[in-house]
Amino acid sequence: MKNGNEAAKDDAAKLKAYLGFSLRSGKIVLGADKIAETRRGVRLILADSDMGKTALKRLKAAADESGAPLYLYDGRLGELLSIPAVKAAALKDKNLAKAAEGAVCAGEKWNLYSEGEI
């Protein structure tokens, strides 16, 4: 049986893998501006909790319009993506979004900011 720390590492590793699959398949949108432009087809939005208010407002509007949940990460999303400058990402594939949301919900560093349905 795994302790809480080991389970959290497993969830982070799973999320990192799902984000990697999304990158390789082109089913991810990176950056608040691009997410706000795309909106349609977005299934899950992930962002750093320390994003600027304007960018966060745009992500919330994109989440509301697309019906996608928006989760804020108390860490660096870019590190999970291996692209340090990235502060927001949106998954477009339904199955990857569901799997990623499962890993996000199990993690302690994530908070639901805006509800939605994948």
Q: Can you say where each PLM-predicted feature lies in the sequence?
A:
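N-terminal first-folded block
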Residues: D11-A47
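Small/polar loops that bind or transfer phosphate-bearing groups
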Residues: A47-D48, K92
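SAM-dependent transferase fold signal centered on methyltransferase-like domains
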Residues: G4, A32, A47, E108, ...
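Glycine-rich phosphate-binding loops at beta-strand->alpha-helix junctions
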Residues: S49-K53
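Long, charged, low-complexity intrinsically disordered regions
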Residues: K2, E6-A8
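C-terminal structural segments of small proteins and small subunits
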Residues: G78-E117
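Positively charged, polar, low-complexity stretches
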Residues: F21-G26, L30-A36, T54-L80
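Structural motif
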Residues: K27, R43-L44, P69-Y71, K87-A89
